Amino acid sequence: MMPVILLLLLSLAIRCADGKAVQGDSDPSASLLTGDKNHDLPVKRDCTTCAGEECCGRCTCPWGDNCSCIEWGK
């Protein structure tokens, strides 16, 4: 009976490793194991000119020439 319990504990230790994947560590190997993706990576979007400045979002012009840039995600 004791060898069966030891085998179960060993299999859990191998699956959980040091617990980093369970705790959400930012280690790349942990993210591969859990399937997590980092959503904080900067993404280069197509930028345009809005009111004479570079705008990487939505350019709104409610009153003709009074344009403003609203960045994506804000």
UniProtKB/Swiss-Prot annotation:
Contains four disulfide bonds. The keyword Phosphoprotein does not apply. Expressed by the venom duct. The modification Tryptophan amide is found at residue 72. Residues 1-19 form the signal peptide. GO terms for cellular component: extracellular region. Residues 20-43 form a propeptide. Disulfide bonds: none annotated. Keywords: Amidation, Cleavage on pair of basic residues, Disulfide bond, Secreted, Signal, Toxin. GO terms for molecular function: toxin activity. It is found in: Secreted. Belongs to the conotoxin V superfamily. The cysteine framework is XV (C-C-CC-C-C-C-C). This is Conotoxin Vi15a.
